Amino acid sequence: MLQNIRIVLVETSHTGNMGSVARAMKTMGLTNLWLVNPLVKPDSQAIALAAGASDVIGNAQIVDTLDEALAGCSLVVGTSARSRTLPWPMLDPRECGLKSVAEAANTPVALVFGRERVGLTNDELQKCHYHVAIAANPEYSSLNLAMAVQVIAYEVRMAWLATQENGDAADHEETPYPLVDDLERFYGHLEQTLLSTGFIRENHPGQVMNKLRRLFTRARPESQELNILRGILASIEQQNKGK
């Protein structure tokens, strides 16, 4: 189950942080590390700061885009330290741990951490089902990357231990949710349909599509429900072709 939980680091700029994150992960039983377009490659400093978790560094998946790191996942949670202009469903670390473990029983889950200085972009955060914020001291809320990973990884482990005590099947998520790849195809299909009907303009699709993403993220349709929505879009396209 824990192997299904990916820790995804976006454009990390310090190899020492990679090593410290690997150590934070392994102490909590997590080993599935993904590096998205790292600005530096893991080196001897990363190995040194991993302190016995060099296998996590050595087995890390290095990819060019966030989409590659999220492929195959049914749940994506992004860390966010500041309020955004576009509200999004929020979790605290404990809720994040519970949801991640429940869903990881069946499909991969991605926990996404942003750049050391600026975090995740709004576009990256919109690829997430939920955002998670750590309730640090508001007068000094400066958590480094490894600290943030440690907090979330601890809550994941606590949730996982609870399932071991209560029986593996007790908290498993049974609802079949679509994978991130399926959702992105749906959003592409939706945008094309709205363009073809004239509901949105080709040079200004962003605001409407952003709000629709938020709507469907909040509703979180099941796989069967998403198929119905795709069928509706296909029917609209057929009607337009017949005109």
UniProtKB/Swiss-Prot annotation:
Domain of life, per lineage: Bacteria
Residue sites binding S-adenosyl-L-methionine per the record: T79, S80, A81, G114, I134, S141, S142, L143
InterPro entries: Alpha/beta_knot_MTases, RNA_MeTrfase_TrmJ/LasT, SpoU_MeTrfase, tRNA_m1G_MTases_N
Gene3D superfamilies: 1.10.8.590, 3.40.1280.10
One protein family per Pfam: SpoU_methylase
EC number: 2.1.1.200
UniProtKB keywords: Cytoplasm, Methyltransferase, S-adenosyl-L-methionine, Transferase, tRNA processing
Reactions the enzyme catalyzes: cytidine(32) in tRNA + S-adenosyl-L-methionine = 2'-O-methylcytidine(32) in tRNA + S-adenosyl-L-homocysteine + H(+); uridine(32) in tRNA + S-adenosyl-L-methionine = 2'-O-methyluridine(32) in tRNA + S-adenosyl-L-homocysteine + H(+)
One Gene Ontology cellular component annotation held by this UniProt entry: cytosol
Enzyme class: transferase
Subcellular location(s) per record: Cytoplasm
One annotated GO biological process: tRNA nucleoside ribose methylation
Gene Ontology MF annotations: RNA binding; tRNA (cytidine(32)/uridine(32)-2'-O)-methyltransferase activity
Family: Belongs to the class IV-like SAM-binding methyltransferase superfamily. RNA methyltransferase TrmH family.
Description of how the protein assembles with itself and partners: Homodimer.
NCBIfam families: PRK15114.1, rRNA_methyl_1
Role this protein plays: Catalyzes the formation of 2'O-methylated cytidine (Cm32) or 2'O-methylated uridine (Um32) at position 32 in tRNA.
Name of this chain's protein: tRNA (cytidine/uridine-2'-O-)-methyltransferase TrmJ
Organism name: Salmonella typhimurium (strain LT2 / SGSC1412 / ATCC 700720)
Gene that specifies this protein: trmJ
